[in-house]
Amino acid sequence: MAPPGHLLFLFLLPVAASQTNEGSCSGCGPLSLPLLAGLVAADAVMSLLIVGVVFVCMRLHSRPAQEDGRVYINMPGRG
C-alpha cells in the first residue's frame, strides 16, 4: 500500500496543476522532428534493454539447484 505522503501528493497534484498559467513556459519551443524521433527511439531501446536484463536475470534465477535430486520428506512433489 502507498505511504500516506504519496496519497497526499496525488490529491494535491491537480490543485498545483490548476495554479500554473498556460503561457508559463518561457523559452520553450516546439520539438523538432529528429529530436522527437531520437527521444522515442532512445525510449524504445532502453525499454528493450530493461526487458532483456530482467529476462536474463529471471532465467538464471529459475534454474534448478544442483542438489535438486535429494528426497525431502515434508515437500510434496520432490520425492
Swiss-Prot record:
Extracellular domain ranges by topology: 19-35
Record's comment on post-translational modification: Phosphorylated; PIK3R1 and GRB2 associate specifically with tyrosine-phosphorylated HCST. O-glycosylated.
Keyword Membrane tagged: yes
An individual GO BP term: positive regulation of phosphatidylinositol 3-kinase/protein kinase B signal transduction
Residues in compartment: Cytoplasmic: 57-79
Residue list for modification Phosphotyrosine: Y72
Annotated stretches, region: PIK3R1 binding site: 72-75
A cellular component term, taken from the record's GO annotations: plasma membrane
Pfam family, one: DAP10
Entry's localization field: Membrane
Signal peptide feature range: 1-18
Keyword flag Magnesium: no
Membrane topology per record: Single-pass type I membrane protein
Region GRB2 binding site: start-end pairs: 72-74
Keywords of the record: Disulfide bond, Glycoprotein, Membrane, Phosphoprotein, Signal, Transmembrane, Transmembrane helix
Chain ranges passing through the membrane: 36-56
A Gene Ontology molecular function term of the record: phosphatidylinositol 3-kinase binding
Family: Belongs to the DAP10 family.
Protein task: Transmembrane adapter protein which associates with KLRK1 to form an activation receptor KLRK1-HCST in lymphoid and myeloid cells; this receptor plays a major role in triggering cytotoxicity against target cells expressing cell surface ligands such as MHC class I chain-related MICA and MICB, and UL16-binding proteins (ULBPs); these ligands are up-regulated by stress conditions and pathological state such as viral infection and tumor transformation. Functions as a docking site for PI3-kinase PIK3R1 and GRB2.
Quaternary data: Homodimer; Disulfide-linked. Heterohexamer composed of four subunits of HCST/DAP10 and two subunits of KLRK1. Interacts (via transmembrane domain) with KLRK1 (via transmembrane domain); the interaction is required for KLRK1 NK cell surface and induces NK cell-mediated cytotoxicity. Interacts with PIK3R1 and GRB2. Interacts with CLEC5A. Forms an CLEC5A/TYROBP/HCST trimolecular complex depending almost solely on TYROBP. Interacts with CD300H.
Protein name, UniProt field: Hematopoietic cell signal transducer
